[in-house]
């Protein structure tokens, strides 16, 4: 009986071992783990379709997409939860605060680009990181400048949608 239990521990196909955490790429020297979460096809699909890892995008396009998303979602908490939330100027205050935060984040990205960041390494979730992005100071600076443009654009879009919500609802019923 004990031999059967010991033998089953070494079989990845044994149903009792399906949710066991394995070393990444079955190599314990890498210092990374392959878990049911980060090795699942859904996680891999989601992460690999984010702008940072999607193949074939220039650093400027990546920065624009990431900036648009961040500017859009940063606007909401500032406008609806900020200190001016119950005033007529809440949306304008949210827009200005979101733009201010995007400018600060762009400065942080620029500082990071000047620190000579390491290249992306393959991992369980992203086995083939894009080689054309984030590999030089210039690509990081292109990403940061496009992030600024996209972030301001995303905040402005969110501002116009929120400020004109009554008109938009009237158009669509």
From Swiss-Prot:
Highest taxon in the source lineage: Bacteria
Subcellular location: Cellular thylakoid membrane
One GO cellular component, as annotated: plasma membrane-derived thylakoid membrane
Disulfide bonds: none
Gene3D superfamilies tied to this protein: Photosystem I PsaL, reaction centre subunit XI (1.20.1240.10)
Encoding gene per record: psaL
Example of a GO biological process term: photosynthesis
SUPFAM superfamilies given in the database record: Photosystem I reaction center subunit XI, PsaL
Native organism: Nostoc punctiforme (strain ATCC 29133 / PCC 73102)
Keywords: Membrane, Photosynthesis, Photosystem I, Thylakoid, Transmembrane, Transmembrane helix
Membrane topology, record value: Multi-pass membrane protein
Keyword NADP: no
Transmembrane segments: 92-112, 148-168
Family statement drawn from the similarity comment of this UniProt entry: Belongs to the PsaL family.
Annotated coiled-coil segments of the chain: none
Main subcellular location of this protein, as a coarse class: membrane
The protein's name: Photosystem I reaction center subunit XI
Annotated Pfam families: PsaL
């Amino acid at each position: 009986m004990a031999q059967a239990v010991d033998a089953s521990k070494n079989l990845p196909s044994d149903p009792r071992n399906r949710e066991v955490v394995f070393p990444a790429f079955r190599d314990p020297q890498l210092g990374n783990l392959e878990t049911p979460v980060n090795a699942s096809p859904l996680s891999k699909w989601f992460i690999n379709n984010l702008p940072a890892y999607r193949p074939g995008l220039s650093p400027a396009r990546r920065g624009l997409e990431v900036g648009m998303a961040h500017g859009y979602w940063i606007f909401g908490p500032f406008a609806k939860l900020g200190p001016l939330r119950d005033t007529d100027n809440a949306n304008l205050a949210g827009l200005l605060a979101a733009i201010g935060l995007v400018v600060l984040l762009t400065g942080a990205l620029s500082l990071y680009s000047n620190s000579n960041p390491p290249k992306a390494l393959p991992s369980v979730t992203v086995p083939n990181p894009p080689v054309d992005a984030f590999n030089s100071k210039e690509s990081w600076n292109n990403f940061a400048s496009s992030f600024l443009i996209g972030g301001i654009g995303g905040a402005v879009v969110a501002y116009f949608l929120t400020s004109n919500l009554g008109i938009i609802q009237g158009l669509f019923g």
